[in-house]
Amino acid sequence: MRNNELLESTAERLKILKAVASAVRLDILEYLKDPTGNFPAQIDGDRVRDGVCADFIREKLGIAAATASRHLTLLTDAGLLFATRKKGWTFYRRNEQAIRRFAKQLQSDL
């Protein structure tokens, strides 16, 4: 494994660990792994290419909009999700490269 494939700092690793240290956030990552299987079709935005509308994620989780927003922001700030604004809505999709990189780092650390 080359060094550039690993996360650069302990702070970066801790930020990601904190982001995934929640059952709800782990559920979000799991649901977004199969967006077409877990969410209904959207009028604006392709579920795979553009991501899933935050409102559909909130509905799937059965939580308040503010709570969903906080969870999605933590995952996005940690680099595990991409957020895309489109026609007044925010769509989220997984950052597969960052997830793989974190998994490699975790395996290396432990």
How would you describe each model-predicted region?
Residues A98-F102:
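Short, charged/polar, Gly/Pro-enriched secondary-structure boundary elements
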